[in-house]
């Protein structure tokens, strides 16, 4: 009985943290960035849609309890990026309008997949299936996970890792990885469905920690066949910027009372301190010299907000970052900043939380 009361109290506390079930940010995002289930990024003249944008929108629709939008996003993604069947085809990562010289057709522009987007789609399907009692979503998620497993590679002294895409990330035994493509809570959730993913979770944790020895995650990192980091000679590997910033957000979405979060929080403390010094996280960090350029935008602030909130002695830093991300207006022209801000503000407003097994928990009002 006592355990029941405690559990109920925790649930009520979580539920009560949200002032209202309506999520204005999501409604605005839909109105300015979505058409018929398609998320549009107008920063590219081809008016592109990426599997990333679709995957994030699925998660936001789930958090908002917006079943109609979820179904619309899923249908557009499946029909336009996955040849009509996500159980058989990984979604192409890039869709848009070809140039006039190429006929100005609306079509897939790059057939390669983006593994992180596939993971987010499968995760959203798993959790929508569980929370909304939709076994068809779970079946689809399992099929996507099976396709992803084909791109898992075992790296000596590192472990199992997931390639960022089917093509272009292997070279004579070395693998090029993107730390922001490895949200550990998603891999933990996959492992509950298929134990084979447990080793990918473990290898990905090692990759995240080893790729950031000074506390700053790189946009990309290459490991040789012995599991050693290849010299950071190229610009991608020598910089932590627009890709890497998500790594801190995913780390802070990990359940707080876990050894995994403790390891990540300790490793990424230098980024929190950098955000304190600059007022916001740096837009770019040179990982060879640790030189930093100017402070990043509101989306960058949002990515480090929760990590700062959980870091002892950084309450003032978290408050400044909260103010920064709150200042962002969701507009059509700012796709990437929009999605980072939506993740950060929803997390800070306790519209969702993720437990130690990677399960998504939502306040009752938003289901």
Where are these regions (language model features)?
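Positively charged n-region of N-terminal signal peptides that target proteins for export
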Residues: 1-4
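Aromatic-rich carbohydrate-recognition surfaces in CAZymes
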Residues: 50-57, 107-129
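Short glycine/serine- and small hydrophobic-enriched flexible loop segments
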Residues: 58-65, 120-130, 185-189, 249-253, ...
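C-terminal functional modules
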Residues: 285, 289-367
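N-terminal signal peptide c-region/cleavage motif recognized by signal peptidases
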Residues: 14-16
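Extended ligand-binding clefts on enzyme/binding-domain cores
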Residues: 21-24, 47-51, 88-92, 115-116, ...
